[in-house]
Structures are given as C-alpha cells and as structure tokens.
Amino acid sequence: MKKSIICLVSLLCLALGFTSCEKKQSAGKTDITYYAEIVLNGDATMVVGKGTTFVDPGFKATMKGEDVTDKVTVTSTVDTSTSGIYSITYSIANADGFLASTSRTVIVLDLTDPVEGFWACTPTSYRTNTNTGDAVAYGASFEILIIGKGGGNYEVDDLLAGWYCQRAGYGTNYAMQAIINIADGGAITLLGSYVPGWGDAADALSADAKYDAAAKKINYTVTYAGYLDFTVELNKVDL
C-alpha cells in the first residue's frame, strides 16, 4: 500500500499475529505455552469506496497445527458511509489466556471527490532555511493522504509532505496534521495544524496555495518554526 500509510496513525497497519512458544517456570517445572498464528487473506491495508459494501477477505488461524479459525474474535470499526481510516482486529487467546492478534487497515475514500485520496510530492519540492537562504530538495517522492470532511474542508495527514515523518524517519508523531479548506476556484486556506512530537503548528500557509483540478496538482508553501519554508508540489496518485 501507499507509503503515506507510514504516517497515518502508525497505525493500524501493524500486524501483531505470530506463532511461537515460550517456556513458563513454576514450582520447579517448565511448561511450554503455544500461541496461535493468524494469517490474513488479501492485503493488510485496503482502500474501499465510500458507500460501497466492504467484504472482509477473511483469515486463517492455526495453533500447534490445528485449525482454530472459528475461535478468533473479530472486532471491526469499518463504516463505509464515512470517509476515514478504520481497523479490523483479529484476536485469539490460547489455553493459558495469552493473546495473539493481528489487524487490517481499511481506508474508506469518496472516489467521486477529486481531492480525496493519496498525493505524492515531487522530488524537487524543497525546504528553505530563511535565515541562511539554504535550500534542500526532498530528493524523493513521499505520499500523503487527504480525506474530505465536508464543506470544502479536508484533513491532511502531513502538510509537510513527509519531510520529517518519512524522509527523516522520525515517524508519525512528526507529521504535520492539518485541516485545509479548498474554495471553488481552488484557493487553499489553512484552518489548523499540529505536530504532536513537538507540540507546535505551522506559522502560515502561502497566499498562493492552490489546487489545480485540471492538472491534478496542489502547490503551496508552509512556513514552520519561524524560519523554515516548505515549498511543496503534490500530484494525485491513481488508485
């Protein structure tokens, strides 16, 4: 799945299922406890259209060579009536009460909304230190996710287009979560932002920030930390 999912809530893509055994010692005796292995059918991350019916591809669970699929508990938050990121958790406890689990991420997108979906920054996007004038290119394409919230408002999982989260490898806490508004003519305004890892936000979004529907591009400059300008060009990623 798309690289931006790294920055989506670290999320939900994490597979915890495993098969193993471990020794337990009690009163001078050593026992072995076995864990189940849960294997997903299909992808661990799936994209489905808003308003469609989601069908779980299923899974298989085994423990000590025995099929225990029917003993797995499935918990799902998937709601295809609303765009968003959802999870399905599959879990099973062994005879000793130890849990094995794995999960699937389901991203619900309005496929009729041209803005909603995955976007990739161009490698020539760049960060400028306004104190020194030094500019550094992104050097690679990093993907982000934009989800509609209604009324022309959109949630962006990383307004910095992966600079810290993906390029620097800092992880999800250093993605700049943001809410933007896109007007009918394509003008973009910033309604709010937040970087959890540093507890701060963007200083400003450039007045010329623009969504070009015909070219399927988004261009903007976001000022951060008082002296860093991130000049970003995004291209829509076809699913």
Residue ranges and their predicted role:
Residues 51-53, 64, 73, 77-79, ...:
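Disulfide-stabilized cysteine-rich extracellular repeat microdomains
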Residues 64-104:
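Serine/threonine-rich, repeat-prone extracellular segments and beta-strand-based repeat modules
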Residues 80-83, 105-120:
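N-terminal helix-cap/turn-to-beta initiation motif at the start of protein domains
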Residues 112-239:
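Ser/Thr/Gly/Pro-rich, low-complexity flexible regions
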